[in-house]
């Protein structure tokens, strides 16, 4: 019985770890065949944008319609400008 519990635990942990490098395209309004690398990159842009603006709604607006809204474009622009600014 202990072996069965250990195996179930390992399977659960491995499943959680393996899923960290992929995202569900439907969560972003994307087609199922969307490139995972692009999805991860765009998701990271939205997370950075949310952190930059310190507003939780930014992430939701940024990722809407598979990153095709003006909010996403503004995030890309804002992050580029933030990189150009000298650190305080």
UniProtKB/Swiss-Prot annotation:
Localisation per UniProt entry: Secreted
GO cellular component terms attached to this protein's record: extracellular region
UniProt GO MF annotations: neuropeptide hormone activity
Post-translational modification: The N-terminus is blocked.
Disulfide bonds: 30-66, 46-62, 49-75
Keywords: Disulfide bond, Pyrrolidone carboxylic acid, Secreted, Signal
Signal peptide annotation: 1-19
Keyword Isomerase: no
Tissue and organ expression note: Expressed by the venom gland.
Xref: InterPro entries: Crust_neurhormone_CS (IPR018251), Crust_neurohorm (IPR031098), Crust_neurohorm_sf (IPR035957)
Keyword Signal: yes
Gene3D superfamilies noted in UniProt: Crustacean CHH/MIH/GIH neurohormone
Pyrrolidone carboxylic acid: residues bearing it: 20
Task of the protein: May increase the toxicity of alpha-latrotoxin and/or other venom components. Is non-toxic to mice and to the cockroach Periplaneta americana.
Family membership: Belongs to the arthropod CHH/MIH/GIH/VIH hormone family.
Misc. remarks from the entry: Co-purifies with latroinsectotoxin.
Name under which the protein is recorded: Alpha-latrotoxin-associated low molecular weight protein-2
Organism: Latrodectus tredecimguttatus
């Amino acid at each position: 019985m202990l072996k069965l519990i250990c195996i179930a635990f390992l399977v659960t942990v491995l499943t959680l770890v393996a899923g960290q490098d992929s995202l569900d395209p439907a969560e972003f309004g994307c087609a199922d065949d969307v490139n995972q690398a692009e999805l991860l990159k765009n998701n990271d842009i939205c997370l950075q944008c949310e952190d930059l603006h310190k507003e939780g709604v930014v992430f939701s607006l940024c990722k809407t319609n598979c990153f095709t809204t003006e909010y996403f474009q503004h995030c890309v622009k804002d992050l580029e400008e933030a990189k150009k600014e000298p650190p305080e």
